[in-house]
Structure formats: structure tokens, C-alpha cells
Amino acid sequence: MNVKQPIRLGVNIDHVATIRQARHTPYPSVLHAAFVAEQAGAGGITAHLREDRRHIQDRDIELLREHIETRLNLEMAVTDEMVAIACRIHPHACCLVPERREELTTEGGLDVAGHLDRIGETCRRLGDAGIEVSLFIDPEPAQIEAAARAGAPVIELHTGRYADARNDQERSIELEKLRHAASVAEALGLQVNAGHGLTYANVGAICRIPQIVELNIGHAIVARAFFSGLKEAVADMVTLLHTARWG
């Protein structure tokens, strides 16, 4: 693995839509946010079309697919409705995630090993439509091996436990799990992405895992944008990723 390979930043713009949906106004524009993120160096745009439509709406996905210049990564649950939407809109990539209506945000990885047939069938349907499929999973070898059996070419490692670690010892343990998981995935021929809970303060160590190709980050960027502006917030994260990988 070439440690000099740059990391692609996928900017998750869900929380731009969260602000809009709080008042059900036409602003702020998700599409405008995506344009600004691209201008600042984002390598892709990520959006989660949840079953309850709490933030991103169907029309947002359609507009993003029609107009952005980079990659659209659609996060979605493993349901027939979402597969049909993905096959109609045809994003560059789909990341399959677990989903519960009562959760504030995605709380854990997919149980691929426990639902191998259903997830495998979804991977086949999306793959047959020419859509790259990734599976959002915890950094557990059994889940990574199941992802390979399901036919997904990409995994996204759930970094939430690392991000939520209460002290340096816990953080070190979770970081080692991520490093080992990335090595297991590489040995199985899988592309490794990662995300969830990553911030400007904790992303550096993740960048130094050489197998990681893409990081999807949203909340921290949108939060910083309140004070510095979205373009600067994205540019700061792009610079941080490159410095951590190459420095």
C-alpha cells in the first residue's frame, strides 16, 4: 500500500438540510453547499436519504446527481424503496447503513454476517445497475469477511467508537482495531473508507492508516462553518487530511 496516496474527503451535507428542515424553508440550499464544498477541495459529496426524510429529501438527491462535478455517495438503508430510488437516480456510489427511526445519528455498523443473503442481494442489484457499493461496518474481522462474501467492493469502517473514546487508552485500543480492520480488508481486496464522528481534532491518526482511501465527514465541518464559513471549513479539513497523510 502506497502511504503517499491522497485521501479523498467526502463532505456529508446532511446537516445543511437539517437546518433547512427545522423551519421547512427553501434555504439553506443543499446544492449550493455542495458546490461550495467542491470549490474548497472536496472529492465527493455524501448525503443520507433516511426513510423518515428528517433532513435530506428525494429532490436533493436528484439535484445533486444532476449538478455536482465530483462523486455523489448516497447513504441508504437496505430496503426495496431505497434500492429503487438509487437505481433511478444512479449515484456514483451507495453506502448501505443500518437505520433506526429513533436514533439521532447512525449508531453502529451493519450486521452483514447476520443478514448476508439480504445484503448480498442488495449489493448485486446495485452493482448490476453500475453503482459502486460500500457497506458501513464496525471494525470487526467477521463483518469484513462477510462484506467480501456479500460482494461489496468497498467497506466504510465505523469510526464512532474511536471518536467517542473517553481517554487516551480507550482511543488507542479503538485505533488499533481500525488499523487491523483495514489490513484485513486490504488482504481481501476491499477498498477501505471510514467515517463517523470524525473531527478536526481526532482525524489525524485515522489519516495515517495507509489503506484508507476516503473519509466521510459532515457534522464537524458544518459546525465549524457557522464561524468560519463553509468554504474555509472544508478547505481546512482537506489541508488537515493531506498534512496528516503526508507529514
Swiss-Prot record:
State the protein's name: Pyridoxine 5'-phosphate synthase
Recall the taxonomic lineage recorded for the source organism: Bacteria, Pseudomonadati, Pseudomonadota, Gammaproteobacteria, Methylococcales
Judging by the UniProt lineage, the source's domain of life is: Bacteria
Which residues constitute the catalytic centre? H48 (proton acceptor), E75 (proton acceptor), H196 (proton donor)
Q: Which PANTHER family match?
A: PYRIDOXINE 5'-PHOSPHATE SYNTHASE
> Where can this protein be found?
Cytoplasm
Q: Where along this sequence does the record place binding of 1-deoxy-D-xylulose 5-phosphate?
A: D14, H15, R50, H55, T105
Site feature (Transition state stabilizer) residues: E156
Predominant location category: cytoplasm
Binding site residues for 3-amino-2-oxopropyl phosphate: N12, R23, G197, G218, H219
Q: Does the keyword Coiled coil apply?
A: no
Q: Which family does it belong to?
A: Belongs to the PNP synthase family.
Its quaternary organisation is: Homooctamer; tetramer of dimers.
EC code(s) of this entry: 2.6.99.2
Write the record's keywords in alphabetical order, separated by commas. Cytoplasm, Pyridoxine biosynthesis, Transferase
